[in-house]
């Protein structure tokens, strides 16, 4: 893993990032799990899956709609890429033994998130024309793409820059760690150590838990939770699986294709909070995240924290006794000031852009003014007759679960009332990171504490009172009840849960329903996105088609034992998908049932309900 990188290798890297082959949707071809071979679960091509027809309450299915229907909107949903800096001191992989609450602190495929996102972008681009035909054989062009949150994993500046490059296109450099300088110090390092760290940074070498030579002398058990692809050393399923040079290869630049459509961004909890849960400053994480000291697995026993909540675990890390143990497990790594947490204003500005094509530039002037620039919800109509509304469901007071604060709830209610009062109301599709069942945080935004010049990030920038906060299903004035009051709402499209799931929410008076569509993540199996198309069947019903989309990387991954130093970015993405597969015999619930993947979701056309 200590191979030097030359200009020749950079050129080779760029040449190997070739355009992806045409990517079939899962309606034409699926990926199925095969047997394990040489320690890796094999992935095989399988037959496509037809769209399962599902009806909301009160819908009569009439034959012949395929010859009558008209496309109203065709768009792609990408969710939960979790682009991450796997070398960051803020990753805290040493907590891997703390149980379920810390289970996402390490994944064997986590160094490959930028390549997976690029591979997914390539797949979306291959579907610029719909595979579904409307009346007269017409096929719609892709109107836009939407990212429903958790583009980054740890709310870091460098992670945000990486996903922006993946979505916009151009040369993407996924390595972190910069040479030591007066502006990027490593206090206490000897001249020899400074020289070693600077060489590692300049040569884009990986430093972290997946290179066991980076923390020699640790107790033998400390290495077993973390797969080292150079040696194949690890406990469990990837023991003896080798891909020499993989971790260094993952740090090398490649050419990202970039989306060919406008794309709109929805806020997720990992985009704004460390580990997706920490909204306030943390005594340990904030001090070490940009510096040159990383806590590696060692004498600290994370099993002592098993059974605790994630919040309790992170609180305990600031205790004097725990800090003393953690200091003894620290090793030097190249520092990087770009590992700092982004402020919400910075995040908004990155996505606003002069053309406002990424959504956050579409926040209304009144909401901008009242929120002091903190509002991150907006509405737009790229096609006549359909209104899209993007919500910010991040519970800024902390925690992984979402809510809708009261100012946003009032704005949404006003948007829906205004639409309902039109002579011909537009159909409404809601986008959010959290699905309704994930909106149950009762924590107010004020828990973060106010922003100040000395504290521009990890603070409550909105001067308005957030309470009462609104849940998805329970409590007073839940979001479901608000959406059901307006028949024009036909769908809510979300992510967060890392699994495919579809369910209807019907109105008690029988006046239609709306569909909740939840799509899997890019970081965990099956690493899918979704193509969505809203159709007017011209018989009093609408169809929302959802088609699961695999990313463009080859289905079979490179063979175990192959030298990874010359892998293309698509081969890296293919290997990521294979590494993310569930254990043999374990459930694959993240794929969902047949009725959660490729679906035709029928609902009564609210424009024809009358009065």
Spans of features found by a protein language model:
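Metal-dependent phosphoesterase/phosphodiesterase active-site architecture
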Residues: 25-136, 143-146, 187-247, 254, ...
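Short, proline-enriched alpha-helix->beta-strand connector loops that line the catalytic pocket
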Residues: 258-262, 488, 512
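Short, well-ordered beta-to-alpha junction loops that form the rim of enzyme active sites
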Residues: 149-150, 268-270, 392-393, 431-435, ...
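Histidine-centered catalytic micro-motifs
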Residues: 81-83, 431-437, 490-502
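Secretory targeting and sorting signals
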Residues: 2-24
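Short acidic, glycine-rich surface-loop motifs adjacent to enzyme active sites
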Residues: 419-440
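Catalytic cores of eukaryotic secretory-pathway lumenal/extracellular enzymes that build
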Residues: 145-146, 154, 159-166, 171, ...
């Amino acid at each position: 893993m200590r191979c030097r990188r030359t200009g020749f290798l950079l050129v080779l890297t760029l040449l190997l990032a070739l355009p992806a082959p045409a990517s079939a949707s899962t309606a034409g071809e699926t990926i199925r799990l095969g047997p394990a071979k040489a320690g890796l679960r094999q992935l095989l091509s399988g037959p496509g899956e037809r769209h399962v027809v599902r009806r909301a309450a009160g819908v009569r299915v009439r034959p012949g709609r395929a010859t009558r229907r008209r496309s109203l909107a065709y768009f792609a949903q990408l969710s939960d890429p979790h682009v991450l800096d796997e070398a960051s001191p803020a990753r805290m992989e040493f907590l891997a033994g703390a149980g379920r609450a810390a289970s996402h602190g390490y994944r064997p495929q986590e160094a490959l998130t930028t390549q997976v996102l690029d591979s997914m972008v390539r797949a979306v681009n291959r579907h610029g024309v719909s595979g579904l035909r409307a009346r007269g054989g017409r096929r719609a062009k892709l109107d836009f793409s939407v990212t429903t949150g958790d583009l980054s994993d740890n709310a870091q500046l460098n992670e945000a820059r990486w996903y922006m490059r993946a979505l916009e296109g151009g040369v993407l450099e996924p390595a972190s760690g910069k040479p030591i300088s007066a502006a990027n110090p490593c206090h206490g390092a000897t001249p020899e150590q400074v020289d070693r760290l600077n060489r590692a940074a300049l040569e884009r070498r990986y430093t972290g838990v997946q290179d066991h030579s980076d923390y020699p002398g640790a107790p033998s058990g400390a290495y077993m939770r973390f797969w080292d692809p150079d040696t194949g050393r690890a406990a469990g399923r990837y023991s003896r699986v080798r891909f020499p040079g993989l971790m260094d290869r993952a740090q090398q630049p490649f050419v990202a294709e970039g989306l060919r459509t406008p794309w709109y961004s929805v806020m997720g909890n990992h985009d704004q909070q460390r580990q997706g849960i920490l909204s306030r400053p943390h005594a340990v994480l904030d001090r070490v995240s940009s510096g040159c000291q990383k806590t590696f697995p060692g004498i600290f026993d994370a099993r002592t924290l098993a059974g605790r909540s994630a919040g309790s675990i992170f609180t305990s890390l600031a205790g004097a006794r725990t800090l003393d143990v953690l200091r003894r497990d620290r090793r030097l790594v190249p520092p990087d000031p770009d590992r700092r947490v982004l402020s919400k204003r910075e995040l908004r500005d990155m996505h606003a852009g002069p053309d406002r094509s990424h959504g956050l530039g579409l926040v209304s002037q009144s909401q901008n003014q009242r929120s002091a620039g903190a509002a991150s919800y907006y509405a737009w109509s790229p096609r006549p007759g359909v209104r899209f509304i993007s919500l910010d469901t991040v519970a800024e007071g902390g925690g992984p679960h979402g809510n809708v604060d009261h100012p946003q709830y009032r704005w949404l209610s006003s948007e829906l009332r205004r639409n309902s009062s039109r002579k011909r109301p537009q159909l409404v599709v809601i986008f959010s990171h959290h699905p309704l069942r994930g909106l149950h945080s009762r924590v107010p935004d004020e828990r973060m504490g106010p922003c100040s010049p000395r504290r521009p990030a990890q603070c409550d920038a909105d001067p308005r009172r957030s309470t009462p906060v609104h849940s998805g299903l329970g409590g007073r004035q839940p979001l479901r009840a608000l959406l059901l009051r307006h028949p024009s709402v036909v769908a809510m499209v979300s992510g967060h849960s890392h699994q495919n799931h579809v369910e209807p929410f019907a109105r008690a008076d029988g006046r239609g329903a709306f569909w909740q569509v939840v799509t899997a993540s890019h970081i965990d199996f099956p690493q899918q996105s979704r193509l969505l198309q809203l159709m007017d069947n011209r018989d009093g019903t609408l169809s929302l088609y959802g088609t699961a989309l695999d990313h463009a990387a080859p289905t079979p991954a490179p063979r175990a034992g192959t030298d990874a130093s010359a892998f293309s970015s698509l081969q890296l993405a293919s290997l990521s998908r294979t590494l993310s597969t569930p254990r043999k015999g374990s459930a694959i619930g993240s794929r969902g049932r047949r009725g959660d993947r490729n679906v035709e979701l029928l609902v009564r056309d609210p424009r024809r309900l009358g009065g």
